Amino acid sequence: PFFKRVGSDLYVTKEIKVTEALLGTDVEVPSIEGPKRVTIPPGIKSHGKVRLKGLGVPDTNKGINGDQYVEVIIDIPKRLTDRQKTLLEELKREGI
């Protein structure tokens, strides 16, 4: 897995679908302790972050671990089926 380290905090990205961003979802992400389940809240925006407290790198000066952040990237499909287009048009009429 690819982690970005900033101080004692770790950052990882996770791609999710548009529907998962709108409705919320549970996803598995890597951590230095192994895979972890993370709840992505409904309505999260692309590049929004979810914090995993204490799952970063140990900070020897403070005696605590940093945090891990999961940056959410929303995957916008380039192609839609006719059914998907119809459903999205219905949602558009509903104001979503």
Predicted regions and their residues:
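Intrinsically disordered, low-complexity linker/assembly segments
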Residues: 1-96
